[in-house]
Amino acid sequence: RSTLMRSSAASDVYKRQSEAELKKRRAAVTEQNKLYDSITEFIRPQLCDLENILKNIENNSGDISVNYAGACVVNVYIKRISNLLIMAKSRKMLNAFELENSIRELAEYISVYGISCSFFSNVSGEISAEKTIALFKFIGIFIRHIMNCTDALLFNLKVHDRFIDLKINCDSKNEMKIPDDLLDDITKLGGNVTTEYDADTLFVFVRMQSGGDDI
């Protein structure tokens, strides 16, 4: 009888452990699905852009090589911003190289698209994950606005002494207004955006502290 009782008790313990493990796994899957849903919502404009480009390719609309190159630019942005969002889920601070490498890869594919694009950088230390995402989103949406109306683009990123300085030079026949909601993403994190337009060139300057507790 005592053997049966011990066996029953062991079975109950195993059952409780299994139920607890199952609940933990379900919670992890639910949390992961929430993260993927939030990422999908974050990149929805770019997903729409990509879908439109692929439709153009399917319908033989426009230059096919330009369409493919444009799809690559959008795809790289989606990949990089998604990676940053995933990393930000578990880390408040990210190595500055994450932002640097994201911009560099994007610049490479912009050049493939046919825009003369240069990227210079000098970075060290860490940047708050929230600001890393805000800055790369700023660049992504900026590119989305100017891709079809510029021939040359230059990015200069400097992260030093607790500050982030991003400079963008863009050949443009018309002065471009930075969307207010894009400015808000930077200013609400304590950053500052200024623009100048001179001799068919748009100059954009973004400055903010690199830490996450200066707001």
Regions found by a protein language model. Name each.
Residues 41-122:
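Conserved DHp (HisKA) dimerization/phosphotransfer helix of two-component histidine kinases, i.e.
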Residues 174-203:
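ATP phosphate-binding glycine-rich loop and adjacent ATP-lid/helix-beta elements
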